[in-house]
């Protein structure tokens, strides 16, 4: 995180995947303090536990959308408060096994739900989260200029 901060210019934007232990663990409060002091937390996307299992990592993680701002601006934001985009994704479209077996949407009869081209639709919430972000970004001034 510190190295990313060093690489970014002022008002630079970044996204980083972090284990949830960094965001919630009592022993890592200093990391959260570092982030909050130096970055505007524009958004947090909580990922399901099984997200990285097919790649060998058994860890719950989140994506942080951050913007580097100067210390004066950060002090003002932290004093006045600001909104952030938050979303909790529960369905990733595949099973939490080493193969990442795809999971498709099914109806109440147990039949696959198909799109307009006759293809099975993945059972995932990433698309909805992306739409939510796009709407949020269009309505709110999320990135400081």
Feature map (PLM): residue ranges:
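A conserved structural/catalytic subdomain of Rossmann-like adenosyl-cofactor enzymes
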Residues: 1-145
């Amino acid at each position: 995180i510190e190295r990313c901060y060093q690489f970014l210019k002022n008002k630079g934007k970044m996204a980083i995947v972090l284990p949830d232990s960094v965001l919630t663990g009592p022993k890592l409060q200093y990391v959260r303090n570092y982030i909050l002091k130096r970055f505007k937390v524009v958004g947090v996307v909580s990922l399901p536990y099984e997200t990285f299992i097919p790649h060998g990592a058994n860890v719950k993680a989140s994506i942080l959308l951050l913007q580097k701002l100067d210390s004066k601006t950060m002090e003002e934001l932290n004093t006045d408060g600001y909104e952030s985009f938050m979303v909790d994704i529960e369905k990733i479209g595949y099973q939490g096994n080493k193969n990442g077996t795809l999971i498709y949407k099914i109806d109440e009869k147990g039949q696959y739900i198909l799109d307009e081209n006759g293809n099975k639709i993945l059972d995932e919430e990433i698309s909805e989260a992306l739409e939510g972000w796009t709407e949020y970004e269009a309505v709110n001034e999320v990135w400081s200029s």
